[in-house]
From Swiss-Prot:
It comes from the Bacteria. Belongs to the MnmG family. The keyword tRNA processing applies. GO terms for cellular component: cytoplasm. NAD(+) binds at residues 290-304. Homodimer. Heterotetramer of two MnmE and two MnmG subunits. This is tRNA uridine 5-carboxymethylaminomethyl modification enzyme MnmG. The keyword Cytoplasm applies.
Amino acid sequence: MQDHHSTNESFDIVVIGGGHAGCEAAITSAKLGFSTALFTINLDRIAWQPCNPAVGGPAKSQLVHEVDALGGIIGKLADKTAIQKRILNASKGPAVWALRAQTDKREYSKKMIEILQNTDNLSLKEAMITELDIAKTEEIGLNSKKIVKKRIKGVRTFFGSYYSARSVIITAGTFLEGRIWIGNKSMSAGRSGEQAAKGLTKNLHEIGIKTERLKTGTPARVDKRSIIFDELDAQPSTAADKYFSFDPNIKNNMPQVSCHITRTTTKTHQLIRDNLHLTPIYGGFIDSKGPRYCPSIEDKIVKFADKESHQIFLEPEGINTPEIYVQGFSTGLPENIQLELLRTLPGLSECKMLRPAYAVEYDYIPATQLQTSLETKEIEYLFSAGQINGTTGYEEAAAQGLVAGVNATRKLNEKDPIIFTRESSYIGTMINDLITKDLKEPYRVLTSRSEYRLTLRGDNADRRLTPLGYQIGLIDEKRWWAYQEKMNLLEEEKLRLNNTRLKNTDEISKNIELDTGSKIKGSTTLKELLKRPNFHYSDLIKYNLTEKNLGSSIQEGVEIDIKYEGYLKRQKNNIEQINRQSCKSLPQEINYEKIDTLSLEARENLNKIKPKNFGDASKIPGVSKADLTALLVWLKIREIKKEKANIFVKKSYHLKSNPSEH
């Protein structure tokens, strides 16, 4: 780096990138009392939602709840700017319930900018960072071997300004040497309409940080005034009263709108097949890996060739914009074919395309180079968070940003880092996966990745993490008081239900038996009653068996705790068993493709590698602890079936060899 005696400003922490990871990191470090500068290429596009204008969904909503429970921002902003909310997987168990909010993307960005501008200790800077300044010192290690230690000193911008920093957090998203593709044409860009970050990748290589290349994409936006809504199924907002944030003061004043559903047709599929050679991937123009769980429409047609139709969602990007996001329809096809393709969908036969779909490839830092704190192993006081670590999604980015922000401040305070474990949070599950597995495709958090998913629910994220948020200093006294009040009410109610009995001779008991079809033998506690699958907390209210008017979140928490008490104990035992089974051999003849309790990714990778034992299987990318649990259960069932078959064979042989017994 050039001579930098002319320092523009000095900061405790510099954050590079103003996306969802960068905003959480910067706000976190500033709230904890450290002078922080957030650098971004475009101050008007802070916390932008360049892909779907939505927050939450399966596992992602659990992450948002966790970030909020710790004192982060994403949940509050999603609640304040939501224009539609739905509960996904509501017919399944609470482990996979997920809140998803359609947000007004411009309002979301606007409110984040307001928060940043009004956060003490935080400065916003529009500049492109191209160099990290590193100090090197030599130390004598074991066997008198010299060790070169590297430590961050500051950053330099494209135009030469220098800022000293005690710690740096890189949250560059898709901007590092980003290139967008439409068909066989490409241009340098971090995302559509914004320049890529140039120079920093080269500098990272020079200081010992490796990068690789990934790809993602986003679908076209169409003008809602050109859509024939009569041909579509409406999907209204059904959970406007549900919140990501545990803060009781968060409210939503946004109008609620509907999304709409359409489907691909045989004409859609044929048009894609006829033009596959024009896409960046199938045409061979790029070979970067895209996200497995958010495939392009051409990937869907190729990989699921037997499927006659795919569901497509039309999602509003905001209240005051005509733009509609065509969810599930990302593509790399040329622009003219994209429009033709869109017009094969019911309701879109006359649509006008406002923005074309495009693919974007970018440099990322494989997270195996990071410690659990998200500090790089190579350079002290240098942290990395968000999509640059190989993840995909605003929620994953926000969670990493908060972790990096917390641990950068703790490093400066010479305190131990906060380590999030798999059993404590989805945040811990994600970070553990990132730093231990050599991932070659964008990582998305999934409920199936967690072996503790019944414990790591969205509704109890505050119980798991708010005490930690308070200890760190991100939860204020008012919020802490509200949390303690909620915990007291929850525990008091569980105790009351355990101590209150009903006799089968009581009039209420007779009514309950009549309504539910389940007998009450002798007497039962309200807790035992609530354990029944066809009895809910709402029934306690119905039969006037409550004492206090408890909030819906407390009612839900009480019911889940009681109903799933046994499952939670069994889950814990399964995990302990897994940890003891690392040397258990795996028969080489197993066809993992036939084990449908495994994730698709796990089946594919296990079949390819054929591990010898559980220990080897646990090291394979894409094989989660949840997959190992499922595999262990499958092997047990297999062994029981074999034992039964052997007993049957022995009995048959015994009968044949003793004909006199007949």
